[in-house]
Amino acid sequence: MMLVAADEGYAPGESPVRVIADARLPVGTGVLPLYLSQDWDVPLPAVTRAVIVLHGRRRDADTYYAAAQNAADAAGSAARGSLLIVPQFLAGVDVRHHRLPPDMLHWTLESWMGGEPAEAPAPISSFDALDAILARLMDRAGFPNLRSVVVAGHSGGGQVAHRYAVLGRGGDRLQAVGLAVRYVVANPSSYVYFNPERPTLDGGFARFPAARCPGFDAWKYGMNGLPPYAGAAAPAALEAPFAGRQVVYLWGGGDTDRDQPALDRSCAAAAQGPHRLARGQAYFAYLKARHPDLAHRAAVVPGVGHDGGAMFRSAPGLAALFDKN
């Protein structure tokens, strides 16, 4: 199954999603649709791993659910005991087209990728929704043998996974009760930098001239103007915990098209590099320079472009999602 560029880069005014996920999770006063590979309303003692897969900008959770299932099939016995979870972050156009109930959470076309508040029914962050999923997994009556949780995304979903690894609170709560948590960030268009430095042509880093792009360091590209979800968190206090979390970056070796329609070509994104592969490798080098003991890992998947299904089914993808050797 090919998950390609349009996952992240549909034009403004995009059409509604074809399918609404069939399960529901209350989040505050709202409701989040999602796909589940097993009914979690009954105890699931056989589940030892939960894999949360985040869709791209098209919000096509059905496509990503199928891709997650294909990856699990490819992982074979390594995926035994896995619960697959694919939440769906809807837009207003989806709610109107499908005549969904007024309590269905929905965001603007892009705001959910940065953890911004929902448009309705309440200003609930997409990160609040991920917190709610992780809180559900903490229920030891429902998941008595759960040992690990993976939060993975490709393209626009990779942006969510990355930024949730920076700001999210749910993962630390899981770790506090003894569960392992990993974030898998595949082929996003941009990353969060912790200071005004950006890559230079000689492979180093230097303070980026703000006059060339006044918003280059604003959230979601930098730490200025964090979303309400962050609360009183000081940007300087976020970096060290992030560097210590288990994060895996996956980049397609062929995801190098500077003119690919879905590529974020804003000046803030362009300040990070010419294409996704370059941006990802530069960001990893940036983190390594700042944190020699960085807990993060990275892998390039040769011959794969902007294709989420192929990324997840690759050897590095199966290792990241299911610990397949």
Kindly give the residue locations of the regions a language model identified.
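Active-site glycine-rich loops that stabilize anionic/oxyanionic intermediates
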Residues: H55-R59, S189
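Alpha/beta-hydrolase active-site loop
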Residues: D103-G142
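Gly/Ala-rich beta-loop-alpha elbow adjacent to hydrolase catalytic centers
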Residues: G153, G157
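A domain-start/cap signature at the N-terminus of enzymes
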Residues: M1-A50, R58, D62-L83, S111-A122, ...
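Conserved alpha/beta-hydrolase
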Residues: A79-D94
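The feature captures the conserved acid-bearing segment of alpha/beta-hydrolase catalytic domains
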Residues: V177-A289
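Structural cue for short, hydrophobic secondary-structure segments
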Residues: V51-G56, V86, Y249
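C-terminal catalytic histidine-bearing segment of alpha/beta-hydrolase fold enzymes
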Residues: L250, D264, Q281-N325
